[in-house]
């Protein structure tokens, strides 16, 4: 929801202070691995400032909470792992949107549309933006697969019992049928 508008404004305002400043932040987010970012988030947000819990997916006494309390508790515990999971995907999709929109802005059909007298904003929205969304839609399935399959390092750091941690523990315990099942399911999700 943020990647498309941010990539759009970065392409429209190319080489401005906004584009250069956000590019630095985006490349930092892309360069930092998710498990390192998770570790830094735990140190800063959980240990130093105690804003969020450091580990687990639920609090002690979760069963005694009401339905709204359970939803709030799960949301509260999932903020840091989600940030660690999604930052690199966010950076990748933002730069993908920017680069494809810039390619489409320089395409012949944009020059043709502008020479026909269509306003620049209309040509941008009707022609360039629509064609730039195709790679985003193509890559979205890959991002969802990575999110569902999980990162066993992030799940290990945050002590979340998920799909990635199941695969990690199966490798450590040499449980080859579970390893094969995890790999097969991950491969099916990638298709």
Where are these regions (language model features)?
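Juxtamembrane transmembrane-helix termini
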Residues: 13, 46-56, 98, 102
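Membrane-water interface segments at the C-terminal ends of transmembrane alpha-helices
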Residues: 25-55, 84-90
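Peri-membrane helix termini and adjoining interfacial loops of integral membrane proteins
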Residues: 48-63, 155-161
